[in-house]
């Protein structure tokens, strides 16, 4: 056997070893629900998008019930710019007026959602695109953001327009889909009882869905490896109390704070464990679920 044949044999042996070692994890998650929040750089990279779709297809084929929730901030900003719609910001947060929320719904529940559905379907599965309006799945209320002025230390409440937070989740439709061959792909748009449409932060939306489904795992695909310590080293596992302390001592800071707070709330609402992982790593979902070392920061109660 020459060097080329040896090399090919080694590759096949490694693939076989991975499949063999993955079996206990596949059995662990069989018939369980895994919610995956898809966002960040991975959404803008065609190769990563195809790898993600293949991961989701493999989960379904392994007897797992995946539910995908996606964001789309950069794509919304791009369409607003093309349409000549100027955004107004309060403390760095976009104010979503009536015209903008129409664009948000068009982009999130329309083009982005259907692109993800098509990617998963191309892998031989049946994905279906939905948002909070479908089947009265999610109802939202207007969200208010409280900020403290750094100079005066006066607390101020920001009105961000048609930005909402989920207050009711009906799992009926998702349970029906879990019993079928369908994979739900959810856009974070929902109605209010007031008849208005609200744009919801995708992380918060995913947390609410995972909590309502009492998911085995909630995975957040991000642009970072996970939660890092002050030396930049990945923290492999955290409890809620440990995460709270890391927020207090500012080890966890900036945009990671609301993400970790969403993780903690999901755990309190019945999710078994939450993982923050790097969506820029191809097949990170499989690495997290089907290997001993995982692929990010595991947060548990």
Swiss-Prot record:
It comes from the Bacteria. InterPro entries: AceGlu_kinase-like_sf, AcgluKinase_fam, ArgB, Asp/Glu/Uridylate_kinase, Glu/AcGlu_kinase, NAGK-C. Keywords: Amino-acid biosynthesis, Arginine biosynthesis, ATP-binding, Cytoplasm, Kinase, Nucleotide-binding, Transferase. GO terms for molecular function: acetylglutamate kinase activity; ATP binding. Its main location: cytoplasm. Pathway: Amino-acid biosynthesis; L-arginine biosynthesis; N(2)-acetyl-L-ornithine from L-glutamate: step 2/4. Signal peptide: none annotated. The record marks 37, 259 as: Transition state stabilizer. It catalyses: N-acetyl-L-glutamate + ATP = N-acetyl-L-glutamyl 5-phosphate + ADP. Pfam families: AA_kinase. It is found in: Cytoplasm. Catalyzes the ATP-dependent phosphorylation of N-acetyl-L-glutamate. This is Acetylglutamate kinase. It comes from Bartonella henselae (strain ATCC 49882 / DSM 28221 / CCUG 30454 / Houston 1). The lineage of its organism: Bacteria, Pseudomonadati, Pseudomonadota, Alphaproteobacteria, Hyphomicrobiales.
């Amino acid at each position: 056997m020459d060097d080329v044949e040896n090399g090919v044999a080694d590759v096949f042996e490694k693939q076989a070893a991975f499949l063999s070692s993955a079996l206990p994890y596949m059995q662990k998650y069989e018939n369980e629900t895994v919610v995956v929040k898809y966002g960040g750089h991975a959404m803008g990279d065609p190769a990563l998008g195809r790898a993600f779709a293949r991961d989701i297809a493999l989960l379904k084929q392994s007897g797992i019930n995946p539910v995908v929730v996606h964001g789309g901030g950069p794509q919304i900003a791009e369409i607003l710019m093309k349409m000549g719609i100027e955004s107004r910001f309060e403390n760095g947060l976009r104010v979503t007026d009536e015209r903008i929320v129409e664009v948000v719904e068009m982009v999130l529940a329309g083009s982005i959602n259907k692109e993800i559905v098509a990617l998963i379907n191309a892998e031989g599965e049946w994905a279906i695109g939905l948002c909070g309006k479908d089947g009265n799945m999610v109802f939202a209320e207007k969200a208010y953001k409280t900020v403290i002025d750094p100079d005066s230390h006066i607390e101020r409440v920001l009105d961000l327009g048609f930005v909402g937070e989920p207050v009711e989740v009906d799992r009926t439709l998702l349970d029906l889909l879990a019993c079928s061959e369908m994979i739900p792909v959810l856009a974070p748009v929902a109605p209010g009882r007031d008849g208005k449409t609200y744009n919801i932060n995708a992380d918060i939306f995913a947390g609410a869905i995972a909590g309502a489904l009492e998911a085995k795992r909630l995975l957040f695909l991000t642009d970072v490896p996970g939660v890092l310590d002050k030396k930049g080293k990945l923290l492999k596992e955290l409890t809620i109390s440990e995460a709270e302390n890391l927020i207090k001592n500012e080890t966890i800071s900036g945009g990671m704070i609301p993400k970790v707070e969403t993780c903690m709330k999901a755990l309190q609402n019945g999710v078994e464990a939450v993982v923050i992982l790097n969506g820029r790593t191809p097949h990170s979902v499989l690495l997290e679920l089907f290997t001993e070392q995982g692929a990010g920061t595991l947060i548990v109660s």
